[in-house]
Amino acid sequence: MTYIIYAFAAVFEIAGCFAFWAWLKLEKPAWWLAPGMISLALFAWLLTLVPSDAAGRTFAAYGGIYILASLSWLWLIEGRVPDRYDIGGGLICLAGASVILFAPRA
């Protein structure tokens, strides 16, 4: 269930950040900020649903998912194919996130 929450959180975070990017860098109208802010609020709320007692650990584990989701956004939304360094780096980050997420803790 945690990975599903992280996946949805990533979509909302990336969409929210992209709304700001589009407004500032792509000269989209200011109304793009409203759905961006809503999306970022949903992202933050979703992370509170992760079953963890430590926010920092939750955010660190989420980081690997965020990187893979960002590379997917690069490919699917922006139309730029990730290169081998993007993919390799993403896999390394996902491995690190998995260690954080699945480590046995008392």
UniProtKB/Swiss-Prot annotation:
Membrane topology: Multi-pass membrane protein
Species for this entry: Rhizobium etli (strain ATCC 51251 / DSM 11541 / JCM 21823 / NBRC 15573 / CFN 42)
Family assignment from sequence similarity: Belongs to the UPF0060 family.
Transmembrane segments: 4-24, 30-50, 59-79, 86-106
Keyword Cell inner membrane appears in the UniProt entry: yes
Protein name: UPF0060 membrane protein RHE_CH01408
Localization per Swiss-Prot or TrEMBL: Cell inner membrane
Keywords on record: Cell inner membrane, Cell membrane, Membrane, Transmembrane, Transmembrane helix
GO cellular component terms, semicolon-separated: plasma membrane
